[in-house]
A protein has these predicted regions:
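Active-site acidic carboxylates
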Residues: 1-124
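Internal catalytic-core helix/loop-beta-alpha segment
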Residues: 111-150
């Protein structure tokens, strides 16, 4: 008798009901997920781009390809996709908590700005819901709870 692999030992089969399942894609924006904009640009201007190379490599080589696979699967199954963006709606970031507003301003993560947009490799579809949070929690500053219960 063979010993199951670690993955097999902790994996369970399950079925998702597309009518009751949503894929949440959170904070995949240029402000923090693009090495040439927002945080990436800020770190480069500060001479610290090397400190974030691992971060952006992982986003580009691991995170984005896997999110693309999930999007394809959820769209094929007819399940909902909800995008949660993060940033200020007000140009002066006055709608963001005081401890978060400085980084929002420094990365230009303001609604309507290119930095606030979802990274080019991942774009919401016409039937996807996009909710913007102005705090760190999507349930606190968006209609996510209502959308999931609908």
């Amino acid at each position: 008798m063979s010993t199951p692999s670690f993955v097999d030992a902790f994996s369970q089969q399950f079925t998702l009901d597309p009518a009751r399942t949503a894929l949440l894609i959170i904070d995949m924006q240029n402000a923090t997920g693009n090495r040439h904009m927002g945080l990436g640009q800020l770190l480069a201007e500060q001479g610290n781009s090397d400190s974030a190379q691992y971060r952006f490599d992982r986003i580009e080589q691991l995170l984005i390809p896997n999110i693309q696979k999930l999007i394809e699967g959820f769209r094929t199954a007819g399940a909902s996709i909800i995008w949660i963006t993060y940033g200020a709606n007000a140009r002066d970031a006055s709608d963001a908590p005081p401890h978060i507003a400085p980084i929002i301003k420094a990365t230009n993560n303001i609604a309507g700005q290119p930095e606030h947009e979802v990274v080019d490799a991942l774009k919401p579809g016409p039937d996807d819901l996009v909710l913007n949070k102005t705090t760190q929690g999507a349930f606190r500053s968006t209609a996510l709870d209502s959308a999931l219960r609908a």
